[in-house]
């Protein structure tokens, strides 16, 4: 993503800096998205020429000063540029509706935060996206991390109209409901928020009927102090409240465990392994313009796959996860399915038989990273 880095990826120079920082340190192939912010429309086509897969924008405060939101007029300027070359624009689809936190509400209760970001924020934003998608016609538009099922009717109508609109949701929206979030447990905070069980069921219906095109992690970790989490033992910013959902960093950490999470919940709802492959591999590769290289096991494509046992018990242990800041809502969650090996372009880059007791994030990885930077031409096949 273009904003969880310094500098944000909103110019060609920032894109090149990010690419250089990844050199010789990747176990998987990596590409990046550029960002649309006020005033950078002239940088979009040059970033595409360098290899950016497309662009992301925010319709509300991103929480990052270097990545401000864009308004409707600024979107039109950006989409005019993207229309010249068929570039994709992805939307963090929330817009302000006037909802706020009442000063009398307890910020350590999840409901306080949830009520501050009602479904109407997503519905308002997605209505705008649909209108712009219709107006600009050939600009592929994508809704990232859909949370509110209230927006599904507008999405279904846009797709029935034949507009170039796609939509994703996330593992956490499909596997967690608001009713189960404990007090002070800020590891559950993300934006848009995890909503109630009935909303979750409607999202699943949209996954199963194809309204939602694919499922992703939206992995957004941070240090526990930024989460204002009780595990910090009071070591948080001066004046901050421990366990404050409103003030905590928003983001769910789940990279590497999405497959068992989706499979465990999806299997009982009628999801097949073929469906899982389509939702997390084939459609995501096509979305990133890599459908001619990745996303399927087929002659001529990159040999990227995992070797896993879909029936093996898997109790998620945060300390064994393969990322640095391990605060996650999935700690001690029982799942079905365990990855034994990960293969990238035919090379084994992870092998569970090589895992030891070190709890290092690279535990079990191959000694020599073989990942490549992806800047190949975009394919929509």
Go through each PLM region and give its residues.
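C-terminal cap of metal-dependent C-N hydrolases
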Residues: 232-244, 299-374
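His/Asp/Glu-enriched, well-ordered alpha-helical/loop segment
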Residues: 110-138, 187, 214, 221-311
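Active-site beta->alpha loop and helix N-cap motifs at the rims of alpha/beta catalytic domains
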Residues: 34-41
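Short, ordered loop/turn segments at secondary-structure junctions
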Residues: 3-6, 60, 94-95, 146, ...
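Histidine/acidic residue-rich metal-binding segments in metalloenzymes
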Residues: 42-57, 61-215, 231-235
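Metal-associated gating/positioning segment near the N- to mid-region
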Residues: 1-25
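Short, electropositive alpha-helical surface patch
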Residues: 14-22, 105-118, 147-167, 222-252, ...
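Divalent metal-coordination and catalytic microenvironments
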Residues: 30, 55, 92, 141, ...
């Amino acid at each position: 993503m273009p904003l969880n880095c310094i500098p944000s990826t909103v110019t060609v120079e920032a894109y090149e800096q990010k690419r250089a920082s990844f050199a010789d340190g990747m176990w998987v192939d990596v590409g990046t998205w550029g960002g649309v912010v006020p005033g950078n429309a002239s940088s979009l086509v040059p970033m595409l020429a360098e290899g950016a897969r497309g662009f992301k924008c925010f319709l509300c405060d991103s929480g990052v000063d270097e990545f401000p939101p864009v308004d409707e007029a600024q979107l039109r300027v950006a989409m005019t540029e993207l229309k010249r070359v068929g570039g994709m624009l992805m939307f963090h689809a929330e817009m302000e509706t006037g909802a706020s936190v009442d000063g009398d509400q307890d910020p350590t209760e999840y409901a306080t935060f949830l009520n501050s970001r009602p479904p109407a924020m997503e519905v308002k934003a997605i209505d705008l996206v649909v209108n712009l998608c219709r107006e600009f016609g050939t600009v592929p538009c994508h809704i990232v991390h859909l949370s509110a099922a209230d927006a599904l009717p507008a999405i279904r109508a846009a797709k029935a109209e034949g507009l170039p609109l796609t939509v994703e949701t996330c593992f956490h929206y499909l596997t967690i409901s608001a009713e189960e979030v404990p007090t002070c447990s800020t590891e559950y905070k993300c934006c848009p928020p995890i909503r109630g069980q009935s909303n979750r069921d409607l999202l699943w219906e949209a996954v199963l009927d194809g309204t939602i095109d694919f499922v992703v992690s939206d992995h957004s970790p941070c240090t526990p102090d930024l989460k204002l989490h009780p595990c910090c033992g009071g070591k948080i910013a001066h004046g901050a409240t421990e366990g404050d959902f409103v003030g905590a960093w928003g983001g769910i950490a789940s990279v590497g465990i999405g497959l068992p999470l989706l499979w465990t919940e999806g299997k009982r709802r009628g999801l097949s392994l073929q469906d899982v492959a389509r939702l997390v591999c084939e459609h995501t590769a096509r979305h990133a313009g890599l459908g001619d290289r990745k996303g399927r096991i087929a002659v001529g494509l990159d040999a990227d796959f995992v070797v896993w046992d879909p029936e093996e018990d898997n109790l998620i242990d945060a300390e064994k996860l393969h990322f640095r800041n391990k605060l996650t809502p999935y700690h001690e969650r029982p799942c079905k399915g365990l990855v034994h090996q990960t293969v990238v372009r035919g090379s084994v880059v992870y092998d569970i038989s090589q895992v030891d007791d070190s709890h290092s994030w690279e535990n079990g990885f191959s000694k020599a990273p073989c990942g490549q930077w992806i800047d190949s031409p975009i394919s929509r096949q």
